[in-house]
Amino acid sequence: METPEIAARAASAGAPLTGLLVSRAPHPVVWTVLYLPFGALGGFVSVALTFLATQHGLSISEGALLNGAQLLTQWLKWIWAPLVDITLSRRKWYVISTGLSAVGVLAMSAVPLGPGTLGILLVVIALASLINSVVGMSVEAIMAGTTPPDQIGRVSAWFQAGNLGGTGLGGGLGLLLLEKLPKPWMSGAIMGALFMLCCLALRFTPDVAAQAKLAGKLAAVKRVTRDLRAMLKTKSGLLAAVLCVLPVGTGAAQGTLTQAKVAAFWGAGANQVALMQGLFAGLITAGGCFAGGYLCQRLHPRVAYSGIGLALAAVAVLMGVCPSTVSMYVVWSLVYAFAVGLAYAAFTALVLASIGKGSAATKYNVFASLANFPLWWLGLLLGAAADKWGARAMLLTEATFGVAGVIVFAYSIRLVGRSKLAA
């Protein structure tokens, strides 16, 4: 269960603007379905396109740029997140952004993959990811406005099951379709159609109004700014921000492990990658999300997140030192995927425990942007490490950063604890 501190803070954070509070929450499986397009577009890039990159003349470092282009907008999305809070309703934003994301995945699949088209493809990926970020924002805003404090762990699990399950769906199914269908664009068309089907789950959600409709546009902007400043002036909000910006529990190695040249170190091919980094990984990661949500019902999310970060570092070390066989690639990829699910559920619980309900899209995506920053730069660094020193060194590099991040956070707890900030 959440601590009384979390419950009191979450309740008080949402109290001033009663129009944003929704008394009846849907079953959390709704968040799973609604969040699938967000995860699936990311999986299409990080698994399907990334695996094929080195087969089409790109280096491992260049292949890492594909996921880097996607994550670039994901750690900058705090800039446009306030638009979701102060303009259209969350439902309208979801339908618009999901439709445009469907167009985006079609465009990505239609661009030929190779050194000569890399620049164009990176631009398409970045634009599609920018639009896709609004899919996530709209769901996060509705979810934050309907989740009672004592359900944070449970909701976090279902929510991240949609994110990471979607990554597995977009990656595994996307790669299989790209390899089996006669034309690459057909895979994008099928993925886009699946995105649009997820809109049907909106009928089970309340239509949370934009803050501008409740208080006027200028007042809404002021409120969003005030809510954000108030959150970051608390010990809980500041510590959550510090933990998010550190390279803890990122799962960044997954993007590198999907590349054909890296997977070949263990003797793994397209089928193993599609299953272990795609479809099966999605299922295993979803299981990790539920285990992480259960854990966060019993531990403070900060404690759970830090511990999971150390566990993920240990998994990377073990994968790096074990024999380089296909069976080891399969086993450790699945263990790694489970640990990533734990980490992502703990991240969502950490954020929901800190943001309350007002200006939810903005506040959630400030934390998400902070968390995506280390995922972005560490992913690029791991690609370079794999290029220069090999797959084993890449995994040990990730583990080193993960342990260092937890040490820095432990020291930050001492410093913030001595401050005069509100709890």
Give the positions of each predicted feature.
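C-terminal transmembrane helical hairpin of 12-TM major facilitator-type secondary transporters
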Residues: 302-347
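Helix-loop boundary and gating motifs at the non-cytosolic
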Residues: 13-74, 239, 243, 249-263
